[in-house]
């Protein structure tokens, strides 16, 4: 999460280190924590306006369907999403 939003703004290897260590004890927990970390890291790559909207409330839940089965079309005040998502993790 960006520092201006209360996060550590860590580099990606630093984000993955605790996940890797956790996996030695419980792979399921590491999988879950890894996805939560990945989702926030991906949002930190968006422009500042999108980040402000996402990180303004706590806790912020960020599911991330990584299979691109939908389509986003710009509209007057945002983006209209259409498609079918059979699963998402997070």
Task: Explain the meaning of each model-derived region.
Residues 1-90:
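Glycine-rich flavin
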């Amino acid at each position: 999460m960006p520092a201006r939003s209360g996060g550590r703004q860590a580099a990606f290897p630093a984000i993955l280190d605790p996940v890797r260590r956790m996996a030695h004890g419980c792979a399921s927990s590491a999988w879950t924590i890894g996805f939560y970390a990945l989702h926030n890291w991906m949002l930190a790559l968006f422009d500042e306006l999108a980040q402000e909207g996402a990180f303004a409330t706590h806790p912020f839940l960020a599911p991330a369907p990584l299979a691109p089965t939908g389509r986003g079309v710009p509209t007057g005040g945002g983006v209209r999403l259409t498609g079918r998502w059979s699963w998402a993790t997070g």
